């Protein structure tokens, strides 16, 4: 993307506040025109002194214009600051909202810290560009576009000096941009690596401390910082060279203006006041050209991070739904997968031609080896991504024709990892339904067998649970996850084997809460333990993305197929004469002992 396109796209974010932006632009143009008039008036003051004429009138006009310029500059600075701050926060919030709608696979591939770093650095760069655009860039362009014609009307010969100076600045800027483009992109990559390392080590600080990795991780950060310096310094060298060349050109131009002016005055071809005006023009032009050079430096520096941000914005924009999309209402829970196919890009994994039907209130257990496609089915149900072929219908409605918001409102999920926020207990439960009353929150906690342990905490329901629930035990975290699902009270329930990671005693305590939660709801269980599937109305055995077997527990157990093999491998005897089989390699189903069996 060219530098001009990057700049233009950055400015488009200001269109949300069109009136305020136009006001700032008009004010900036006025400031530029007033600034341009100052050297002319100052030259007239000097000429009046030289001619011993009326000094008061031009001096008063010059002072009045200067006072207006000061007030206008304050107005522009104040308005530009406020507008730029508002838009930075606005863009950050809008982009954040789109980011958290992206599928989990997208975040896993990109990296959470990478997306966060891109967002923060890009919005900071946008803020700087917006602020400088309203404060300086626009006034600089207007001043330069007006200054040369005005100067040419006064004296063509002296104007050539200013034109040559402008050409030199442009040539130096183009040279440096060409030399630093790749280097600045490399700098941005090193910034990401450094930030990712910091984020990674801090999020795993317990491992760092436990394994005495503090010194080694700090040294690794030093190495990343050194690599960043090594990439940054060549870029800085080019800009330092540009600054020196620009300063040399501007100084030489001032000398030429003074020499030519003195020569023309002695020859009677120019007045002293006109020479003073041209000196003011030269100083003004040098200042504006320096601002342009700084602007180019800022834009080139921001180029890589803004390009990455725009790519991220384009990727997330594809997830936006039309405003008039229909909602899914009055869900009963009849679910049909009709020849559903989805394959992950460049992976060869997915689900293929999967068909089954679930009646309202039925429980479906999904089992199979790791990577079989169990979670993919659930993600398709929740429209984390849409099928490449086939369709998924809820109560006869294709899920692609309804809003994701209404679809997910109809589905409550209890993950194996509870996924708690660093907020109070009540706030975490209220994730299920934001407008729930205190009484409803407490009722959900009681139904999840969580009320007693919550009251035992020092601050009860106001107790903060720590990052990802670190201040709670595994059982306590899961009970809060179940409580928020109860509070959501959705007709469709997804259980990612919510108790499989718990000890037997804690699991038994939660079983009743889970059973109560799934009662009279269409329930999907991603099963990691065979004991979970016994009461399921429908068992789906997935392998390599295909639905290999489906039926009730007893039907599949007696069929003698893959599911039956899995039962034997887990230690369950269908018949006394059948020997115990080894565990199926790659299976996600955890064997459990049979009562009375010898281990």
Curated annotation (Swiss-Prot):
Residues 21-301 form the ABC transmembrane type-1 domain. Gene3D superfamilies: ABC transporter type 1, transmembrane domain, P-loop containing nucleotide triphosphate hydrolases. It is found in: Cell inner membrane. It is a multi-pass membrane protein. It is an enzyme of class 7 (translocase). SUPFAM superfamilies: ABC transporter transmembrane region, P-loop containing nucleoside triphosphate hydrolases. It catalyses: [(1->2)-beta-D-glucosyl](n)(in) + ATP + H2O = [(1->2)-beta-D-glucosyl](n)(out) + ADP + phosphate + H(+). GO terms for molecular function: ABC-type beta-glucan transporter activity; ATP binding; ATP hydrolysis activity; ATPase-coupled lipid transmembrane transporter activity. Its EC number is 7.5.2.3. ATP binds at residues 368-375. Pfam families: ABC_membrane, ABC_tran. GO terms for cellular component: plasma membrane. Keywords: ATP-binding, Cell inner membrane, Cell membrane, Membrane, Nucleotide-binding, Sugar transport, Translocase, Transmembrane, Transmembrane helix, Transport. Its main location: membrane. CDD domains: ABC_6TM_NdvA_beta-glucan_exporter_like. Residues 335-569 form the ABC transporter domain. The chain crosses the membrane at residues 22-42, 55-75, 156-176, 248-268, 276-296. In NdvA the ATP-binding domain (NBD) and the transmembrane domain (TMD) are fused. NCBIfam families: chvA (TIGR01192), PRK13657.1 (NF010178). Belongs to the ABC transporter superfamily. Beta-(1-->2)glucan exporter (TC 3.A.1.108.1) family. Homodimer. Involved in beta-(1-->2)glucan export. Transmembrane domains (TMD) form a pore in the inner membrane and the ATP-binding domain (NBD) is responsible for energy generation. PANTHER family: ATP-BINDING CASSETTE SUB-FAMILY B, ATP-BINDING CASSETTE SUB-FAMILY B MEMBER 6. This is Beta-(1-->2)glucan export ATP-binding/permease protein NdvA. It comes from Brucella melitensis biotype 1 (strain ATCC 23456 / CCUG 17765 / NCTC 10094 / 16M).
């Amino acid at each position: 993307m060219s530098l001009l396109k990057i700049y233009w796209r950055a400015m488009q974010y200001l269109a949300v506040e069109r009136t305020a932006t136009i006001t700032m632009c008009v004010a900036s143009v006025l400031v530029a025109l007033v600034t341009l008039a100052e050297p002319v008036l100052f030259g007239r003051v000097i000429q009046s002194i030289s001619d011993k004429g009326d000094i008061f009138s031009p001096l008063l006009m010059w002072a009045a214009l200067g006072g207006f310029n000061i007030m206008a500059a304050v107005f522009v600075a104040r308005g530009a600051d406020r507008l730029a701050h508002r838009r930075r926060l606005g863009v950050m919030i809008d982009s954040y909202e789109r980011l958290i709608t992206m599928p989990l696979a997208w975040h896993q591939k990109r990296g959470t810290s990478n997306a966060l770093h891109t967002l923060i650095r890009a919005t900071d760069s946008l803020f700087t560009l917006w602020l400088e655009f309203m404060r300086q860039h626009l006034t600089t362009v207007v001043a330069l576009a007006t200054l040369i014609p005005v100067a040419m009307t006064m004296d063509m010969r002296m104007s050539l000096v200013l034109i040559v100076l402008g050409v030199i600045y442009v040539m130096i800027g183009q040279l440096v941009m060409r030399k630093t483009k790749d280097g600045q992109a490399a700098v941005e990559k090193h910034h990401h690596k450094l930030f990712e390392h910091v984020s990674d080590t801090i999020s795993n600080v317990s491992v760092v401390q436990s394994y005495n990795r503090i010194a080694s991780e700090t040294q690794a950060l030093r190495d990343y910082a050194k690599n960043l310096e090594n990439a940054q310094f060549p870029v800085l060298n080019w800009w330092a060279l540009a600054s020196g060349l620009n300063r040399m050109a501007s100084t030489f131009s001032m000398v030429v203006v003074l020499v030519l002016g003195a020569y023309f005055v002695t020859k009677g071809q120019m007045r002293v006041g006109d020479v003073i005006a041209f000196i003011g023009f030269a100083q003004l032009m040098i200042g504006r050209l320096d601002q342009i050079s700084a602007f180019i430096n800022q834009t080139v520096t921001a180029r890589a991070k803004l390009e990455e941000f725009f790519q991220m914005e384009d990727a997330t924009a594809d997830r936006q739904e039309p405003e008039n999309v229909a909602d899914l209402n009055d869900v009963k829970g009849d679910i049909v997968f009709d020849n559903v196919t989805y394959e992950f890009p460049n992976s060869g994994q997915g689900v293929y031609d999967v068909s089954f039907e679930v009646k309202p209130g039925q429980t479906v257990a999904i089992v199979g080896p790791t990577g079989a496609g169990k979670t993919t089915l659930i993600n398709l149900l929740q429209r984390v991504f849409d099928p490449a072929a086939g369709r998924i219908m809820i109560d006869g409605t294709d899920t692609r024709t309804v809003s994701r918001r209404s679809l997910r409102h109809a589905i409550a999920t209890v993950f194996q990892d509870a996924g708690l926020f660093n907020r109070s207990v009540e706030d975490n439960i209220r994730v299920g339904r934001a407008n729930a009353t205190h009484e409803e929150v407490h009722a959900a906690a009681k139904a999840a067998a969580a009320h007693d342990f919550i009251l035992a905490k020092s601050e009860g329901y106001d107790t903060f649970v720590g990052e990802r629930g670190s201040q709670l035990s595994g059982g306590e975290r899961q009970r809060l996850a179940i409580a928020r699902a109860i509070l959501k009270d959705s007709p469709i329930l997804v259980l990612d084997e919510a108790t499989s990671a718990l000890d037997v005693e804690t699991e038994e305590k939660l079983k009743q809460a889970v059973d109560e939660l799934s009662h009279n709801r269409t329930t999907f269980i991603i099963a990691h333990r065979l004991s979970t599937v016994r009461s399921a109305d429908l068992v789906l055995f997935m392998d390599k993305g295909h639905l290999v077997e489906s039926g009730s527990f007893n039907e599949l157990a007696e069929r003698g197929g893959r599911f039956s093999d899995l039962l034997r491998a887990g230690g369950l005897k269908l018949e006394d004469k059948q020997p115990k089989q080894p565990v199926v390699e790659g299976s996600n189903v955890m064997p459990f002992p049979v009562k009375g069996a010898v281990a």
